[in-house]
Amino acid sequence: MGTEAQANAITGEALYTRYREMLAQAPVYLYYCGSADPARVEVAFRAAFAGLPNGERRPVPQTQVVNSPAGPVRRFQDAMDVGQGKLILGFRTGGSFRSQESIARGLLFNAIYGGTTTSKLFLHVREKLSLCYFANSSLAQNKGILQVYSGVEFANFQKAEEEILAQLAACQKGEISQEEWEAARRSVMGSLRTTLDAQGRLEEYWLNRFVSGTDFPPEALAEEVDRVTLDQVVETAQKIQLDSIYTLRGKEG
């Protein structure tokens, strides 16, 4: 993203030049969902974008994926005038999730760990131990990154961090109950199948496919999820390594 000094050095002229370059060279993906004839839609889109600067379209750049942490766990901290702390943990997953098989396994792991209201982070860290106002995990498939977000009382930072990591360790050791497994399967497959009911979710789904260079539909991914075994999810969990920890504390905390 650059630095504050680099941002301050940008001139209006340079910014406009870069803007025109982007219009001329950036790849453009147009997505349509509806009942109109595709040929008619294409004609309308071409007319609407005919005024764009015309240049050689650059391919989407490959995303840099760091498979494992480069060194010891990094810690970052900010202090603001806030009444609730934030604790965010960043993990490397051992690689990106681009194939149908790897995405299915990653989705199931995330659902078990912290991606649903039946997950370990929600039921144990938030509900049972009351260490967080909220605690959930998110998987960046194309970057190979897992992030855990939580809202924490200032006095509970250490305990919350330890318990978040303990729940990951439980997944890595295969300590996943049948109830957790079935709940995760229902959640992931249900979410994929209902993607077909919402235009916005379909657009988001296919944008991810374009970026990753794949083209399998939500129904196929749901079928793949149904074939995943618990052992395969545990293998996915075992590749995950802690990389960074960020805390937002109060100015007096």
PLM feature spans:
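M16/MPP (pitrilysin/insulinase) zinc-metallopeptidase core fold and M16-derived inactive scaffolds
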Residues: I112-S130, N142
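Basic, gly/Ser/Thr/Pro-rich low-complexity segments located predominantly at protein N termini
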Residues: A39, G95, S119-K120, P218
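Intrinsically disordered, low-complexity segments enriched in polar/charged residues with Gly/Pro
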Residues: T17, Q62-V65, A111-I112, H124, ...
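His/Glu-based metal-binding/catalytic segments typifying zinc-dependent metallopeptidases
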Residues: R57-T118
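Charge-rich, well-structured scaffold segments of protease-associated domains
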Residues: M1-P59, R105, E127-G253
